[in-house]
């Protein structure tokens, strides 16, 4: 992290009163000493709240499930990593030697986590209103492209995007049974999601349909959707 932090502050649009908070937010767990994981936890909560509040105001007729899907798109790791790269955040990260050699400063998850940590650091440094203003400014371009049409995605896509937004492994689908004659088969599929203790299940006249039903059941089990969306 040899580049001047003042340059990063200009890119972020915020100047820290406590520079140590900023440095901590940029410190990966592979680096010796304290790291940014607690700030990341805090920043993730703030990000989800600010994005949810803004979507609630922007889409007054949207249902709960639609709002959840829009928020998942806004806060997913891919989106945050794109923002982080726009700030050249990788130039400022404090990484352990092994992580540095393996190119950790370019890794999507590390960049996204550091950006969330910076949100947490700004909150501690200046309070909620400033943190909200920065988050909304950074996400302005993403908000401009959002419509409720974005919620009309199939359950498998919605489940994948939700899991990606949480930095989780993608779901695994398995056909566990096929019943009926060749011209009239019913497929039975199980969907394994790392956040759930039990696999969700679905059935349909094709494997694709059964997977969609299983994905929809997983979304309900996760509390992302309520079955009426």
Curated annotation (Swiss-Prot):
Per UniProt, the keywords (alphabetical) are: Cytoplasm, Endonuclease, Hydrolase, Magnesium, Metal-binding, mRNA processing, Nuclease, RNA-binding, rRNA processing, rRNA-binding, tRNA processing
> Which residues are Mg(2+)-binding?
40, 113, 116
**Where in or outside the cell is it found?**
Cytoplasm
Instruction: Give the principal location in a single coarse category.
Output: cytoplasm
Give a Gene Ontology cellular component term annotated to this protein.
cytoplasm
Residues annotated as the enzyme's active site: 44, 116
Q: What does this protein do?
A: Digests double-stranded RNA. Involved in the processing of primary rRNA transcript to yield the immediate precursors to the large and small rRNAs (23S and 16S). Processes some mRNAs, and tRNAs when they are encoded in the rRNA operon. Processes pre-crRNA and tracrRNA of type II CRISPR loci if present in the organism.
HAMAP family in the record? RNase_III (MF_00104)
What protein name does the entry list?
Answer: Ribonuclease 3
């Amino acid at each position: 992290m040899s580049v001047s932090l003042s340059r990063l502050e200009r890119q972020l649009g915020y100047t820290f009163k406590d520079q140590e908070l900023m440095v901590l937010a940029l410190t990966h767990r592979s680096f010796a000493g304290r790291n940014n994981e607690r700030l990341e936890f805090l920043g993730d909560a703030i990000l989800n709240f600010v994005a949810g509040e803004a979507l609630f105001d922007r889409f007054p007729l949207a249902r709960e499930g639609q709002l959840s899907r829009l928020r998942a798109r806004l806060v997913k790791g891919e989106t945050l990593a794109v923002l982080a790269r726009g700030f050249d955040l990788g130039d400022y990260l404090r990484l352990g030697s092994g992580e540095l050699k393996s190119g950790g400063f370019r890794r999507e998850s590390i960049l996204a986590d550091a950006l969330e940590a910076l949100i947490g650091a700004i909150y501690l440094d200046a309070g909620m209103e400033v943190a909200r203003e920065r988050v909304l400014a950074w996400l302005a371009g993403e908000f401009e492209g959002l419509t409720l049409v974005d919620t009309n995605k199939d359950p498998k896509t919605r489940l994948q995007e939700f899991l990606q937004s949480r930095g989780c492994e993608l779901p695994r689908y398995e056909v566990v049974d096929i019943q009926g004659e060749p011209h009239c088969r019913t497929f039975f599929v199980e969907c394994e999601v790392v956040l759930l203790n039990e696999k969700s299940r679905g059935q349909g006249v094709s494997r694709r349909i059964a997977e969609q039903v299983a994905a929809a059941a997983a979304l309900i089990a996760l509390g992302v959707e309520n079955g009426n969306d």
